[in-house]
Regions:
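Intrinsic disorder/low-complexity segments
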Residues: 1-4, 320
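A structural signal for multi-pass alpha-helical bundles of membrane permease subunits
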Residues: 115-421
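N-terminal signal-anchor/first transmembrane alpha helix
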Residues: 3-144, 178, 182, 193-229, ...
């Protein structure tokens, strides 16, 4: 039985003490940022030799205790608040501060410490961007998922893992997960096989190779929103090019919720229902547009991999009497495995985050939510319903699914990758 969002009770075993929970309802983000920035600058001061290790950690621990005191008993709130007002200055300081310090003070360090110091100084800009735009949003999304209906307009109550329990009982979440699964299964292998076939054809002694390569790559550099808008007209039931080409006037590609397996087997008297019916015709239309859009990128990458294979291998295979298919099965596919593994990994990760083409082609998620994906459902919960806590829970589950599947496919497929030519 689904759990209503309005009937949720906070579980005491999952929540902090009452006094801390009451304070966390108005817990400002700049307190978290302030503690983190103080920790970073304290560690840098310790690495530069300005502070001993115990002093740097002591200052950070003291500030943390001070912030908790202000959180629980209301005192000294001006200290973290003042630090929070300086938050806009933290990104440029974090980016330029270490580099400037390295130029000014780096040569004063001992010779052995200079190499490590300059290494950290050069790595820090990229590391700072990674922490600010990747690591921190991920951690903050998990933090938001522990509250009840965060919308940044009113205080939110701490809910522990309640959002995740509701998520597991949400039929729309499972519908979105199933649709996303179909999208991954159809688009990733199909796109990779088509791209490999086209790349092999272009790798032969064909005239105007540069022109063909440009033509295949043009869809990828076209804005995805614009491309999806064009395809929406291609799928139009009355004026669409596809219906004219197939002589199927009136077929509404983007509003047909019937599964393609059910449509194909219905003339044979076989009726399929539910998940066995397959993805809807509308979702297959979305997937076809996606394969077309990303095909050029995969073709260019695969063509570069094919051109790196020595021609002597094919010449030796011809002398041994190998056929066209034997050459590509025994030479091309094994030596192209690093490239295909790379594209398969990127395709798997990207397919689980599909949003733009689904939103443009089917803005409502389909007639029966048959084109609803995880990213689309996350968007609806966060920006349409203003429930950022539940949207954050969806984001964290999506992140875990992508992480697990990526690790599994890496473990299964990397053993078959041949990095030696």
């Amino acid at each position: 039985m689904a759990v209503s969002r309005t009937s949720v009770h906070i579980l005491p075993i999952l929540g902090p003490p009452a006094i801390l929970r009451q304070g966390m309802r108005t817990y400002p983000l700049h307190w978290v940022l302030g503690v983190g920035v103080l920790l970073v600058f304290g560690l840098y001061a310790q690495r530069l030799g300005f502070l001993p290790a115990w002093a740097a950690w002591g200052l950070w621990a003291g500030y943390l205790l001070l912030a908790l005191w202000g959180l629980l008993w209301g005192g000294w709130r001006a200290v973290p608040l003042a630090l929070g007002l300086l938050a806009p200055l933290f990104p440029p300081l974090a980016f330029l501060g270490p580099l400037g310090t390295a130029l000014v003070l780096g040569r004063t360090l001992p010779e052995k410490a200079q190499a490590a110091f300059y290494g950290w100084a050069l790595v820090w800009p990229a590391l700072a961007l990674l922490l600010v735009w990747q690591v921190f949003p991920t951690l903050y999304a998990f933090y938001l998922s522990l509250f009840d209906r965060v919308n940044f307009l009113r205080p939110a109550a701490f809910a522990g893992l309640q959002n995740y329990r509701i998520l597991l009982e949400d039929p729309l979440f499972w519908r979105a997960l199933g649709n996303t699964f179909w999208y991954v299964v159809f688009t990733v292998p199909t796109g990779l096989l088509l791209a490999t076939f086209v790349a092999i054809l272009l790798n032969t002694q064909v005239a105007f190779l540069g022109l063909y390569r440009t033509l295949f790559f043009l869809p990828y550099i076209t804005a995805l929103t614009a491309a999806a808008a064009v395809w929406r007209w291609i799928y139009h039931p009355e004026f669409g090019f596809l219906n004219w080409l197939l002589h199927t006037p009136g077929l509404d590609w983007l509003n047909t919720p019937t599964g393609v397996f059910a449509l194909l087997l219905r003339p044979l008297g076989v009726e399929l229902q539910g998940f066995l019916a397959g993805p809807s015709l509308a979702f297959v239309a979305v997937m076809a547009m996606s394969v077309w859009h990303f095909l050029g990128y995969q073709v260019v990458i695969l063509l570069a991999g094919l051109q790196a294979i020595p021609k002597e291998y094919y010449e030796a295979a011809e002398l041994d009497g190998a056929s066209f298919f034997q050459k590509h099965r025994l030479i091309t596919w094994p030596l192209l495995s690093p490239t295909t593994f790379f594209l398969f990994t990127l395709g798997l990760i990207g397919a689980f985050q599909v949003f733009t083409q689904v939103y443009v082609l089917t803005p409502t998620g389909g007639v029966l939510q048959d084109t609803l994906t995880l990213a689309f459902y996350l968007y609806n919960k966060g920006f349409r319903d203003s429930d950022f806590s539940y949207a954050s829970a969806i984001a964290m589950v999506t992140f875990l699914v992508i992480l697990v599947l990526t690790l599994v496919q890496r473990r299964l497929l990397e053993k078959r990758v041949n990095y030696e030519i």
